[in-house]
């Protein structure tokens, strides 16, 4: 069985529960409230070409690991009871393919290490930037350069957006001046970048978000299915694109 708050990989056991519904006319999969961890190691591997994601040139191998895989299934309700599903590495949270009457309710979704990295600008001059890195954004300083990394992945192709909470706006930005600068940790989760920031438009309090521009994964995928219902489902983080119907 699957126990909440065990911090062990529940992926295989949950998939067996989903498959057990195949022989039933109507099923309810019930999760007691708590945390459930999903890892890609034993997850179902799929191959989908999904619109508005990475091209064949950017990511030639279209293979995705899936946390919850519904394939040719009908009349299933997943009752989360406010459970918290935490995904690791790069995974699609769920795929619903060639199904009918599937309902997912009362569950929140997050990643142990979100694919988006964040840091808040504290000080900025034409020659330097001091930023506070979000605790969930894992990084290392290697050869005076900041490297963003996650669970079995490293960011290499950067897309940056600046969030200005004071005005509630988003602005296109660039990681290039940081990529070309010298980085050093000056306090816990605080990094000083020294370089040419004369063209970097930001102000203290802005949050710079950085992700890989290649969308090799999506948050969730619904394919050739009908009567799919999501109720009280909170997606706190997703790799790549969002929920693709």
Regions found by a protein language model. Give the residues of each.
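Extracellular beta-strand-rich solenoid/capping regions of secreted or surface-exposed proteins
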Residues: 15-24, 37-77, 86-105, 113-128, ...
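Extended Gly/Ser/Thr-rich low-complexity repeat segments
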Residues: 108-110, 137-176, 197-219, 225
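Residue-level recognition of beta-strand termini and adjacent short loop/turns
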Residues: 125, 164-179, 183-195
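All-beta strand scaffolds that present successive hydrophobic residues in beta-strands
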Residues: 31, 77-80, 101-107, 202-209, ...
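Acidic Gly/Asp/Thr-rich repetitive segments characteristic of extracellular carbohydrate-active
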Residues: 1-29
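Charge-rich, low-hydrophobicity low-complexity segments
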Residues: 195-199, 236, 241
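Acidic, Ser/Thr-rich low-complexity intrinsically disordered segments
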Residues: 124-138
